[in-house]
A protein has these predicted regions:
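Extreme N-terminal starter segment of soluble prokaryotic enzymes
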Residues: 1-5
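Structural beta-sheet core signal
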Residues: 6, 30-31
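Thiamine diphosphate
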Residues: 9
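Short glycine/serine/threonine-rich phosphate/pyrophosphate-binding segments
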Residues: 12-17
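Short, solvent-exposed amphipathic alpha-helical segments in soluble enzyme
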Residues: 20-23, 46-47
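A generic structural motif
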Residues: 24-29
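Electropositive, gly/pro-rich neighborhoods at or near active sites that engage anionic ligands
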Residues: 33-157
Length: 157
């Protein structure tokens, strides 16, 4: 059995992880970017970890993020209270609420990712690049410092 350790980030990284996952006779460990993790609407999101899990489970959304056949009922209702650009599906929200519950119990992101990987019955190890918060920041030409999700999603940059 060959051991493969793969560093993954973004939607493209999740697609390549799926390719490795589908190889025969390998022991796969995927170390996933957490620089895009962020709190949105009071919920801590780990989008790159989720994209890898969804891709390996075969349930990734058509654009490579979120879950296929997801609904956005909570998101639409929430827009009545707070204007927003970020769309989080109901199934995706459920996973992130579960992650937040585990954080509130004192578990680390590594422990939480292992639990979620087991829930999806995946036969590999998925690890966050860090248990600490490491944020990707973008400094604009006018000097404003933005979180990655704000830059990428809200400004559509």
């Amino acid at each position: 059995m060959k051991k493969i350790v793969y560093l993954s980030g973004g939607i493209g990284g999740a697609k390549l992880a799926k390719g490795f996952y589908n190889l025969n006779d390998i022991d796969l460990t995927i170390i996933v970017n957490t620089g895009d993790d962020e709190n949105i609407h009071g919920v801590r999101l780990s989008p790159d970890i989720d994209s890898v899990i969804y891709a390996l489970a075969g349930i990734e959304g058509q654009f490579g993020w979120g879950q296929k056949n997801d609904t956005f009922s909570v998101n639409e209702e929430y827009k009545k209270y707070i204007p927003q650009e970020f769309n989080l599906g109901d199934k995706d929200l459920a996973l992130n609420l579960f992650r937040n519950q585990l954080f509130s119990e004192g578990k680390s992101l590594t422990q939480i990712t292992n639990i979620i990987t087991d829930k999806f019955d995946l036969n590999c190890k998925i690890l966050p690049m860090s248990n600490n918060v490491v944020s990707t920041k973008i400094k604009t030409s006018n000097g404003k410092l933005l979180d990655f999700q704000e830059y990428f999603v809200e400004l559509k940059s």
